Amino acid sequence: MVLALLGALLVGTVSAQIYIPPVFGKDSLDTRPDELSRLYIPPKRIMWVSHDSLVQNKEVLLLSGNGQPELGKRNMCSMYTCGRDTASILLDYGRELHGGLKLVLGAARPWGTQLVRVRFGESVSEACSEHDGGRRRKGYSTNDHAMRDITMKVPSDGQIEIGNTGFRFVRIDLLGSDAVIRLKEAPAVMRYRNIPYLGSFRCSDPRLNDIWMTGAYTVHLNMQEYLWDGIKRDRVVWLGDMHPEVSTIMAVFGYNEVVDKSIDLACEQFPLPQWLNGMSAYSMWYLIIQYEWYMHNGNLDYLRKHRDYITGLIDCIDSCVDEEGNESLAKSRFLDWPSTPNEAGVEAGYRALLCWALDDGAKLCDLLGEKGHAAKCNAIAGRLKKQIKQPNRLKQAAALMAVAGLMESERACDEIISVGGAKDFSTFYGYYMLQALAKAGEYQQALDIIRQYWGGMLDLGATTFWEDFNLDWSRNAARLDDFVPEGKDDIHGDFGDYCYPGFRHSFCHGWASGPTPWMTRHVLGIEVLDAGCKTIRVNPHLGDLEWAEGTYPTPLGVIYVKHVKKDGGNVVSTVKAPDGIKVVSK
C-alpha cells in the first residue's frame, strides 16, 4: 500500500498527522495541506446599525455560537429592508485580523438566497467607504490584492464564508428590497500560524510593553503561507520589507520555516541577473538577511543551498562598480517611500546600504569557503568608499551611513537623526534610525521616540503598525476605531501617500515592527555573538525604566533576563540560559 492509501501525511516538523480519506488513493500525493490554523472570533461590539427597527436582536451576534445553522429565526439577529430603507450593521472584532467572515443564517424572506454587500475595513471609515475602481484617490478604497468590498448572494438556513483580507471592522448591508435575513452568528475567521511567542518583553512602562507586543503581532499576522509585507496589500514577498520582519521573528518566534520559504521563493521568482523584486536595493537586503538569519540559527546547510545565488549576486554587483567607485546597479533608487523626494539623500543612503550588504556578503563568503568572493566584496566596498556622498539632511540616509560605518554615529544623530525627535521618522527606516541612535549611545532618546512615534499609532486606535505614519497627520485626526466627527481629519481616508493614498494605505505592515527587536536587543541587551546563538552578550540599557525582563528564543532553548535598577542607578541583572550557550557581559 502506498503512503497515500494509508491516509496519513507528516507535514513539515509538525508532529500532528494529516489524514486523507483512502478514496483519494494516489491523488492524495497531489494535495497540499493548509499549514495555517483557523479561529472563529465573534464581534466585540456592535458599532452601528442603520435603524433599530431594521436590525433587531443584534446582541446575539456578540455570542461565540457553535457554527451550526438552525432552521427558523429563534435567537437570531433579524435584518429587514423596507422600500428604500436598507438594513445595515457595522461590527468591530476588537483588533486587526487576517482572514474573512463566516455568516451562519436562519430563515430568509422571501425564502432562498438574498443579496448582501460585505465591506471589510482596517478602520471604521474604510468599512463604510466606497471604492473608486482602482484609481487610488484619497477618501476611496480599493479591492487591490484582496477583495474587501463584495456584493454576493447568501443562503437561507445555511452558512457561507466570505473574504480573505486584513481587517478589524465588517459592514453588512442587506440590498434586496422588502427582504429579511436572519443572522445566527457572524464570527471573523482568523487564519494564522499556530506558533508560540517564545520571546517576550516587559518593563516598568506599559506603553513600551504594548508597542513591543504590537510589533510582534503585526509580523505574526504577516506570517501566512509566505512572509508578506501586509495582510491587506500587497500580500507579496518583498525582500527589503522582510528585514525588520525577520529581525522581529528572531526576537519573538525564533526559527520559522516561513523565512526560508520566502527567501527561496524570491530567488526563484527573480533569478540572476535580475534584482530581487526588480529592485537593486532589495538584493542588498538579501545579503544582510542571510547573514543575520544564519547568525541566529547557525544553519550552514541553508547557506550552502544559496551559495550560487550569493556568489552570483556579488558578481553582478562587481560588474556595476568601476575603479573610481561609480556604480550603475540600477537607475531606480529606493530606500522607503517617504525618502523618495530627496534624491541626493537617497543616493547617499543607497550606497551606504550597498556597503553594509557587501560587509555581510564577505562574511557569508568566508563561511562558505568562498575566499575569492569575500575578497571581491571587500574590494567593491573599497571602491565605493572613494565616493562617500552626503546624506542631505535625510534621516534614512544618515541612519544607513551610521550603521554601515560611513559616518560617525554621534555626528549622524546630532546633525540629522535627532533633529526634531520623531519628526520625519518612517515606519520602515525608523528601525535603522533607532539603531543609529543606539550606536551613538542615545538610548533614552530612542525610547522617547518609540513612545511618541509608534505610540502615536496606538493613540489613534492601532492594534498593528502601519505602512506609513507621519506625526503631523495626528494633529487633528480622529481615531480609526470610531466615526470621524465633523471638523476632524480621517487618519485613514485623508492621508497616506505615494502608492497608498487614503484607504489603500495598509494598517498592518510588517516593516513597521522595528521597535520589537530593537527593545529586545538594546533594552534587554541581548546580542548574538556566535552563530546559532552559541555565545550571547547581555548588556542592558534601561534609560528611564526601573526594570525590564524578557525572554529570547535560540536553537538551544529560551534565554531569560531580568534587569532591575537600584539606588544610584546601578543595574542588577539575572540571566538564565540553556546548556550550550555561553553568556558574556559588557
Descriptions of predicted regions:
Residues 1-18:
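Bacterial Sec-dependent N-terminal signal peptides
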Residues 17-225, 241, 257-259, 301, ...:
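Extracellular/oxidizing-compartment recognition motifs
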Residues 24-25, 31-34, 44, 48, ...:
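Non-catalytic C-terminal accessory modules of carbohydrate-active enzymes
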Residues 126-127, 169, 178-214, 219-221, ...:
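Active-site acid/base region of carbohydrate-active enzymes
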Residues 291, 362, 401-402, 433-434:
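Conserved small-residue packing positions in alpha-helical repeats and bundles
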Residues 410-418, 450:
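Alpha-helical repeat scaffolds
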Residues 421-460:
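Repeat-solenoid scaffold signature
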